[in-house]
């Protein structure tokens, strides 16, 4: 055992000595500024400098259907140009085959309310119970640094059928795509189809950060509070009675396919004369139309009573966002880039062109910032 261990010690020592000897010619002196020894030849290389070119390209229309949110409004940015955003959406009834009343003659519509929440954050709750909010996801011009300039919105019943599947696809069950330029990729969507009947005009709308307080009509007490939102009543109650209530027991309210073919959706069109407004990202999955109605029971008897009820049409169906943007695309020779979202613009840098700088060690490169 002693002889074997001694042999191992000699063998290990031999390899260590050989290792030091083989590395002797690879040593190089390292100074504070880097390797300076002429033996470190592997660290030398040549380089070239090229002109970097920049340009801005307008994006093609992008797919904009089946999203949980929507953009609405108009806005003019002095750097990027003007934006106008609108959308059309399907509706989803809160209940199919509804029974509004045993006798529709005893039913009266009280209110029909459009409710579309803004995105907002709770800041604090006061002792009075009022919640203070801060609005989120809104861009635009503020008047006197206080509030955004207002916009006008017209709400139409749409006669355009939004398909779930693409009939021109080579495979079954391929989803239909719709684009920001009012098209499905093959044909355009006409305003005539989108504007079947005007239902509501919302004038001088601006994003108010205050909570919505729902009050009792008899004693004016607060019975409900809602986060900041578009909250507007429809004037034409007879339209909703004919369109929805009187379809009780009919096939139009039997299932979602029948309903979408019957009531094809709502089109929200920005009708402001000025482009100095705002654009809001709205939470359409939480938006709805609420039909508030009263039903009389035991009419003409001593037990006659009135029951308050509601029926909701949610704006959570398939929707298409439309963008009509007039962007300021900068001159591609001015070494600037303009990058904008939606179907806006992208910046492109050409890093390795064929054109080399004549004096590769000249650091006076073009300023593209």
Please provide the spans of the model-predicted regions.
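Secreted, disulfide-rich extracellular signaling modules
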Residues: 2-369
